[in-house]
Amino acid sequence: LQQASVLSEQRKVASMAMASQLVKMIIPLGMPNTRFRVDILPRKEPESDGMDDIRFMFSANKSAELQPVAQTASGGEISRLMLCIKAMIAGFTALPTVIFDEVDTGVSGDIADKMGDIMQELGTKMQVFAITHLPQIAAKGKDHYFVYKEDTDERTVTRIRKMNKEERVK
């Protein structure tokens, strides 16, 4: 129980810094009124990961109350939250690779370009795989791969190939 108590206190301190940093990161991504808080609630019984239940509370609007992310955030808001959270984790952990699978869902234009900047910056420290349909994100990449499906007589096969310079411009 002593270790669980120490972990709980560390979570409380870290959660405040995390919330503050996340808000600073997400404001330039077109969410100027974002409020974010990590609620750390005691469990009745300790478990292997400690004695806390953790909830991410969020609002993108000035007048809206903070609610659990899953209940209130749109697809585009979740995309931006996930990008910021992954970028923060990557800043504290020596990850060799980070994968973004359509993290740009629900965004476009200038916001997508700014999200691409974040991924490009991460790419200076680690390998970044970004699955995207947006040119603003793809343009930031060093290498591009084309993923496609091909039908054979018996089944459909997914294939991948590296794109050459001319294909990247299309």
What are these regions (language model features)?
Residues 38-42, 58-62, 85-87, 148-149, ...:
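Flexible glycine-/small-residue-rich
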Residues 92-93, 105-113:
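Conserved D-loop-proximal element of ABC-family nucleotide-binding domains
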Residues 101-102:
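Walker B catalytic acidic pair
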Residues 110-170:
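C-terminal lobe/lid and adjacent interdomain/linker elements of RecA-like ASCE P-loop ATPase modules
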Residues 1-45:
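Charged, surface-exposed helical/loop "interaction arms" that form contiguous linear patches used
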Residues 60-63, 76-98, 122:
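GG-anchored amphipathic helix commonly corresponding to the ABC/SMC/Rad50 NBD signature/C-loop
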